[in-house]
C-alpha cells in the first residue's frame, strides 16, 4: 500500500507541469470583447473617463441622469457654499433649522463638496494618467490635467491643503501639500498642458474629438480655457502673493493663443 501511494505521488508530480503549461489566458479571453490595443487605438480606453471628468467640473444633470448628479450639485454647492456665503437662501426649513444658513454645518453636505470636487474627479484623472504613461498620448493627459485642476482648485479654495503633488503615485498614505505648493504645482501643470495642446493646435489635430463634451476636441479653445483658468488662479493670489499672481497673470495674457474673450469661447457641456 505504501508503494502504491508513492507511485501515485510520483505520477501526480509528473502530470503537474503539463497542467501548468496550459494556456489559461487564451481560454479565459472573451473573443467578442474589445482588446486593450483596440481600446487605445480608438480612444475608448480613456474616452469615458474624459467625459466623466468634464461632468465633475460643474456637476449638473440631464433627465437621462435622473436625479443623482443634480442632487450632487445641490448638496455640493447650493445648500453648502452658496448658502454659507449668502448667495442662496431657502424656502424650506432644512434639518429643522440646523444647516449652513444658521452656521450649523451638516457633515453630509460638507463631505459632498469634497467628494464632488476631489474624490470623484481623481478616479477618472488617474485612469487617464495611467493610460498616458502606457501609450505616450500626452495630449489626452494634457486635457485631463486641465479638467482636474478645474475640479481640484475648488477643493483647494474650500478646504485649504489637499493631496496634490503625490496624488496618483500609488502611495498608501498620500501627504497633503500646502496651499502655496498646490498653487505652484497647478500653475506648472497648466503651463505644460497648454504647451502640449498649443503644439497640437499648430498641427491641426484634434484631442478626444468623439468624447470631448465641451469643445469637441478643439485644442485652440482648450488652450484659451486653460489660459483663462491660469489667470483666474493668479487673481486669487493678488493680495496674499502679489509677485506670483503677477507672474502667472502675465503668462496667461501674453500667450500667443490668449484667453477667452468671446461668447464662442465659453465652456459648456452640450
State what each model feature region is:
Residues 9-12, 59, 109, 203:
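Intrinsic structural disorder/low-complexity segments
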Residues 2-3, 44, 199, 229:
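Bimodal feature
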